């Protein structure tokens, strides 16, 4: 057994001990390796002490695993942390519905109680997320002037039928992922769509 193998084995043992022994984990929360600190968030007591850790990934783990941590992090300076809060906790998503970051707002749109407030958002990616999340909203948004929104509608096969001749190749490419439609799009004018068609017909559909 060489030195590197021993080192890897020791790391595995340490990781296993962290997730099974809270006292050991508490002694590791100041570890220099952020991945070790992230493992410590397995325990709520550790996570609460790591909630303001300088490493974004550690804070994300805190927010994802523990509601008490997420409630301290929903206004975190990093949008990826706020996004985790919005993704996992509906009441925090409600507080983030007007977040300055469009990815956070798009995540809020996954909640049925909040999506109605976002269908007219200024950001096309946010409106696209609304269309992707709820079929009944996609039906209302299918004639949007933004191709990104129409692309979101196209993930629904019954709506994609109405979009296979869309002016945007990006929208048609989404339509081409549906196997039942791909066979009708073999002669699409854009090679990028035809690539998707070929791939779909040779593999599986949505």
Outline where the language-model segments fall:
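Alpha-helical scaffold segments
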Residues: 2-206
